[in-house]
């Protein structure tokens, strides 16, 4: 039996020859044909292929790529770190605030506006509950309201109730992308009640229609209300010029409402709560900052005296067909303004019916030439400087040439032989020019002296009330006075003032020569109920007490003497000191003198002054225009009412009755 050989290991054969002849010349093993590898196109390492130059193989280095990737990653990391620092450190508070804003919702709790009362606590301006009528315009789309013309239908229903134009409401309701619109602000509870009842009717009809298989259209479902307050003036137009008014936002826009807006407005509060998905999170708690109500303002005004003054001036302005008029009543001892009335006026409850020209306070904002009521300042200067006494003789010719002007009195007369007291009683322009000419050795010196007294009396300076739009008057420097002004300013032409300044002049004389700045506010009452008096007004002595008393006696002659121009201001039982005025009026439209300013100023009782009353009427066109004739009766009417209201005792003595004239040769 033949011996068995062990299995052979398979060993790769030699490389194949390059050609067929070579392959044929080699023997092959019998057991297995030899398989030879085909030559590679690339030469083995260390060998160079035939016909080719030897070129080394270069492999790409990974280092630049790694560096580029590392740099990019580093920059990304730096950006992340910078952003992290910005969010966590630099702008942490800002992002926290944004997060809190998204997390929490807050709404404002409006502070209750303070009241304005008269000196007795009677409300002149107060706030009552009201509603802002709002809407969600999206709820008026055909999809939500189930009505194709919901905005038009709703506007037609709401317009008569709100008193607005239906077209305007339609426009507000036809904004489907908006979720909030204000249809009307500060409507009374009665208005909202009407709308609410109407909503109930439509909601009931919609429910029945839907139950019957209909669309259930409801064109008022998107109407809502927001509680607020509304400013009201219980006495209508009484003292409207003083009080002013508020705008549509409830902010003071005129008068004391504007001047004292900060005190009246208070501080709004806030309520903040957490929300999620637009819904309140009850477990997150609520942060509430309560609103602080505004302070109540107590005025110096007496409502009853204000009513009497306003009625008197309104009646006379209408009777005289005048442009306007004012009456001021002032406490001579304290400077407190008891009344400040304007005609025509306005009702701050309904500004839509008000004349724009009447919205201010003409008694403080009008500036005009006062005329003869200003002569009292000239007489004060003459007496205080000691250049004349009430009995000094003044010969008053029919005409007087000064500079390039020829001056005359209001009435034609022969030569008058008057005392200085008579010059004031008969309101002689010529006599006043002659008297004030004695104030200096030259006319320039006299001008300087007179100017200083006019300034002391407050001409050309604010009254001290700080009222919005108040005028300071016009008084040029004495070196700037024209030739004409040197002689017209002493009798009240060529300078300008407002009604409050005019009243203050007479209060200064009545108060013994001491000027007290007028006041309109007695004090404030805060949210704690404590009353804080207003600061005491500034005081300044203008003339001596002796001069003031002498002037008061001279002013009595204007009213009491049969030759005086103010006899219509007499009040039985009371001694009255006063002065008439009839000035040429500067027409702001025509730019020259046209028409007259009639006025009367005075105080009572003359022996113990308590009350000052000033009246002026601009451009009376019907009937008389002299101050003593049309303003004297108003003075009497208002002064009598004020004396009785304040329970002022009658005079206990007779007037001195200083001589008015003299006989030549005396």
Predicted features, each with a name:
Residues 2-5, 42-43, 60-94:
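Hydrophobic alpha-helical transmembrane signal-anchor segments
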Residues 531-536, 632-666:
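Short, gly/Ser/Thr-rich active-site loops of penicillin-recognizing serine hydrolases
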Residues 275-286, 332-370, 377-621, 627, ...:
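Beta-lactam-recognizing serine transpeptidase/beta-lactamase-like catalytic domain environment
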Residues 103, 108-112, 321-325, 518:
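Short, small/polar residue-rich loop motifs at catalytic or cofactor-binding pockets
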Residues 127-137, 339-345:
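Short beta->alpha transition motifs characteristic of CBS
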Residues 3, 153-160, 171-293, 615:
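Small/polar-residue-rich segments within soluble enzyme cores
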Residues 281-325:
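Conserved, well-ordered alpha-helix/loop/beta-strand core segments that scaffold catalytic motifs
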Residues 1-41:
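N-terminal targeting leaders characterized by basic, low-complexity, disordered sequences
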